[in-house]
């Protein structure tokens, strides 16, 4: 949802030297260009239970990454995170994105279990955004040692 949210505030980032979409799209809930609608709605319907376990396991490529995350998990309550998803979904449904060039390039993880990689690639292709694929899960950051590595990923 971060790629979508950052795009909504794009005017605040106009002076940024490099803007990278990482494992997301400007249309985050979309059958062709984001999380398929039915999948997202099922996730939302079962969010309280899902956010207790399986969801976060799906964010990572492997058990080792999940173990690292588990040492410093999200501190917000499940109710708060569910509310955030519900509010974001309402915003997504009520926002018409007429994409203007913003992202310099996109990083898409081959093994993203949250947003189908083929949908991300289709979205970035439609928006003429160069895409680099990497062999990671939805949260690729444990595989980089610095922001410079991410920037040089292109």
What residue ranges belong to the model's regions?
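Hydrophobic/aromatic beta-strand patches that form the interior of the parallel beta-sheet core
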Residues: 18-22, 105-107, 132
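Conserved alpha/beta-hydrolase catalytic His-Asp/Glu region
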Residues: 48-89
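Short, conserved loop/helix-junction motifs that constitute active-site signature segments
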Residues: 13-14, 96-101, 125-126
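Short beta-strand/loop motif that positions the catalytic acidic residue
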Residues: 100, 105-108, 112
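Catalytic histidine-centered segment of alpha/beta-hydrolase-like enzymes
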Residues: 114, 131-151
